[in-house]
């Protein structure tokens, strides 16, 4: 793990001009050689670099200049900027290129049909091929020259070397052997290879944009204009003119523009893009609204508390952008292959030429075979295999309400075989409720009195048990008297004076002098008992329990169906933890654990070879979250828990954890498929080209299709159901 210093600064840089993974490797290598760069990673699919550097030794401008000198355009990525911008230079260049390709294509089809009359005269072929090589193919040459200057080779080197070689050979035959030129010029190959490769890059860029549409969808959730109250009048203004604290109105069909609190009105809001919850949520005065939510019914007037990047929506976009720009460990394999891929292909091409010439004594066939090898080899498919799937998978996760911190966290999640869950707030609601009440048979006071007296004392405290008792009394519409606070004994209870009643104690049974009756012993095993006494005479007791969340059982069943071991680790009484575990069908449950105990138990599981995911809620879960291979925090968790976690669950539901595991596994499977396709394509394609089974034109078309097929396979993740 990278050790950051106070001087460390992390920036995201948008890069233009990369044509394959070799380009990304080259930039990464150059940046990491600089002494002030602590870490640099370049994502070819997202066309983005993430750089951590010492801000006392270098500036952002210097980092950008380094990339410029490497031969690529670059700029600091702005907040909410999409990773890949439209490239308007591709369409017109592609149109002209394919207009030139048409006569060559007609001639090729004629030759297949046995007619040579449709072929252009050699001099016309030379003229059109020259336009392509000297003008339309300039981006390939520029990329190749820049790559060679940087000490590396990329796809541009292969394409430009192959097409230029066959173009120069054909020109030589035309001008020095004009009488035999018609049968020995291959201008159509140099033209059509550039055409197919350019078309493939265009389609590849479009497909990459589709793989990133989760980010663009989030960006589109923000309304362009909003209605605000100024000088007692409602006016419509641009969102960027809104100030924090202003009153905003959102009617049915409009989106919320800022995170805020409802001042008046009520309605229903669809927050599915933000939390993964498919059903609209009712909103009333005093409730919170989130930027990007759609008002499906009613009208809401709210006060803006956070705007832009400070909103939950802004956090989501920044988190998704950072994660999509990161690299998964499995990408290292592709990086290693692509770093040596082009040099190896160049050697294979030269060997192909030499062996073919030795065996056939035919320079033309030797040249065609060598060029076919250069053209069919495709490092792009390998380079796209991992990041394309990661970007789609991360977008899918965000739509399901799961934020992965980076690609590495998603990959590690795919390997999880054991899930450790905290009890309170994770499996249970974390809200204590009075489940039973006891009073002696000779009770002097009524049940309502018991509630009133207990609430009068507990109203002065601020812990979950106190809140549960006060809320229960208020729900019964009881008038709660005012007690004079006397003293609190930590871990025991509270004592207060109530006029005309006496000294009231509320707390543990022994603190109030209560010996538990036999009929309460069973409840004690699964509940917290709070006794009440007046003048040291017990008058009753409450049993408070934390109820299971409605979806906890379903979530545990889904985990077990995926052959994942489930373990509960809690600081609560062992009997209470066992009771919850029995309800959920969980065999392993540990109670009375301190935060350090939880971390040690997780380490023991890891030592046994398990890949452990921990799900927790609260500061006391932070050590355990840090100890696990992968950690998930609930969105309402403490800041410490969220900072420690590998991912965040937006719905506060274990079911979202199951969704995260499913998406991560599907993404890893997709990556392996992509790598297999890319490797098989090159393993089969290069020998076929070397032995003359593929012409340069077919090889160029196959090369273009290889990258597109990998991207299309990655896009299948969008349709995965769970």
From Swiss-Prot:
The active site is at residue 422. One of its GO terms (molecular function) is ATP hydrolysis activity. Its EC number is 7.2.2.-. Keywords: ATP-binding, Cell membrane, Magnesium, Membrane, Metal-binding, Nucleotide-binding, Phosphoprotein, Translocase, Transmembrane, Transmembrane helix. It is found in: Cell membrane. It is an enzyme of class 7 (translocase). A metal cation binds at residues 20, 23. It catalyses: ATP + H2O = ADP + phosphate + H(+). Disulfide bonds: none annotated. GO terms for biological process: copper ion homeostasis. GO terms for cellular component: membrane; plasma membrane. Residues 9-75 form the HMA domain. Mg(2+) binds at residues 617, 621. The chain crosses the membrane at residues 94-114, 118-138, 157-177, 180-200, 340-360, 373-393, 523-543, 608-628, 675-695, 697-717. It is a multi-pass membrane protein. Its main location: membrane. Belongs to the cation transport ATPase (P-type) (TC 3.A.3) family. Type IB subfamily. PANTHER family: ATP7, ISOFORM B (PTHR43520), P-TYPE CU(+) TRANSPORTER (PTHR43520:SF8). This is Probable cation-transporting ATPase HI_0290.
């Amino acid at each position: 793990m990278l050790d950051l210093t106070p001087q460390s600064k992390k920036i995201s840089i948008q890069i233009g001009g990369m044509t394959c993974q070799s380009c990304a490797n080259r930039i990464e290598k150059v940046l990491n050689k600089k002494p002030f760069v602590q870490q640099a990673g370049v994502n070819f699919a997202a066309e983005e670099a993430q750089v951590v550097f010492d801000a006392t030794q270098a500036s952002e401008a210097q980092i950008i200049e380094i990339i410029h000198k490497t031969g690529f355009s670059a700029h600091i990525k702005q907040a909410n900027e999409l990773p890949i911008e439209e490239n308007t230079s591709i369409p017109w260049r592609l149109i002209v290129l394919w207009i030139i390709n048409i006569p060559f294509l007609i001639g090729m089809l004629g030759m297949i049909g046995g007619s040579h009359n449709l072929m252009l005269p050699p001099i016309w072929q030379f003229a059109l091929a020259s336009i392509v090589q000297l003008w339309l193919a300039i981006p390939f040459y520029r990329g190749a020259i820049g790559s060679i200057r940087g000490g590396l080779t990329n796809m541009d080197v292969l394409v430009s070397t192959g097409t230029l070689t066959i173009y120069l050979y054909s020109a030589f035959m035309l001008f020095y052997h004009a009488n035999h030129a018609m049968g020995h010029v291959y201008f159509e190959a140099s033209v059509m290879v550039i055409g197919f490769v350019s078309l493939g890059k265009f389609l590849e860029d479009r497909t990459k944009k589709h793989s990133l549409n989760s980010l663009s969808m989030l960006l589109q959730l923000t309304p362009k204009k909003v209605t605000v109250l100024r000088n007692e009048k409602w006016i419509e203004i641009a969102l960027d003119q809104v100030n924090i604290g202003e009153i905003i109105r959102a009617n049915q069909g409009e989106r919320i523009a800022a995170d805020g609190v409802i001042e008046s009105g009520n309605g229903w809001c669809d927050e599915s893009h933000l939390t993964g919850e498919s059903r609209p949520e009712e909103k009333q005065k005093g409730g919170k609204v989130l930027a990007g939510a759609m008002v499906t019914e009613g009208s809401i007037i709210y006060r803006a508390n956070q705007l832009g990047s400070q909103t939950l929506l802004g956090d989501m976009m920044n988190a998704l952008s950072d994660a999509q720009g990161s690299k998964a460990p499995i990408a290292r394999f592709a990086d290693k292959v692509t770093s040596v891929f082009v040099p190896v292909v160049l050697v294979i091409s030269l060997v192909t030429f030499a062996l073919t010439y030795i065996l056939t004594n035919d320079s033309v066939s030797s040249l065609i075979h060598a060029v076919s090898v250069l053209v069919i080899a495709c490092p792009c498919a390998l380079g796209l295999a991992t990041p394309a799937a990661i970007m789609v998978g991360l977008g899918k996760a965000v739509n399901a309400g799961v934020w992965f911190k980076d690609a590495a966290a998603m990959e590690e999640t795919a390997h999880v075989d054991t899930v450790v869950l905290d009890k309170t707030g994770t499996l249970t609601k974390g809200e204590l409720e009075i489940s039973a009440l006891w009073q002696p048979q000779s009770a002097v006071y009524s049940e309502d009195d018991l509630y009133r007296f207990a609430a009068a004392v507990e109203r002065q405290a601020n812990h979950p048990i106190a809140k549960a008792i006060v809320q229960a009394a208020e729900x019964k519409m009881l008038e709660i008297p005012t007690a004079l606070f006397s003293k609190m004994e930590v871990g025991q209870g509270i004592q207060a004076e109530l006029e005309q009643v006496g000294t009231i104690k509320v707390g543990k049974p022994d603190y109030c002098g209560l010996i538990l009756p036999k009929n309460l012993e069973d409840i004690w095993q699964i509940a917290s008992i709070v006794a009440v006494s007046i003048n040291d005479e017990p008058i009753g007791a409450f049993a408070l329990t934390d109820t299971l969340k409605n979806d906890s059982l379903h979530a545990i069943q889904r985990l077990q169906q995926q052959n994942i071991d489930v373990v509960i680790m809690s600081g609560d009484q062992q009997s209470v933890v066992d009771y919850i575990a029995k309800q959920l069908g969980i065999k392993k449950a540990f109670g009375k654990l301190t935060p350090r105990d939880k971390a040690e138990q997780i380490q023991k599981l890891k030592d046994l070879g398990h890949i452990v995911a921990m799900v927790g809620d609260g500061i006391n879960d932070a050590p355990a979250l840090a100890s696990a291979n992968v950690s998930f925090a609930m969105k309402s968790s403490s800041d410490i828990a969220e900072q420690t976690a590998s991912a965040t669950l937006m719905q506060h539901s274990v079911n979202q954890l199951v969704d995260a595991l499913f998406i991560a596994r599907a993404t890893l499977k997709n990556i392996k498929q992509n790598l297999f396709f890319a490797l098989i394509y090159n393993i089969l394609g290069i020998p076929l080209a070397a032995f003359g089974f593929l012409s340069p034109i077919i090889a160029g078309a196959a090369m273009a299709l290889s990258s597109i097929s990998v991207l299309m396979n990655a896009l299948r993740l969008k349709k995965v159901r769970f």
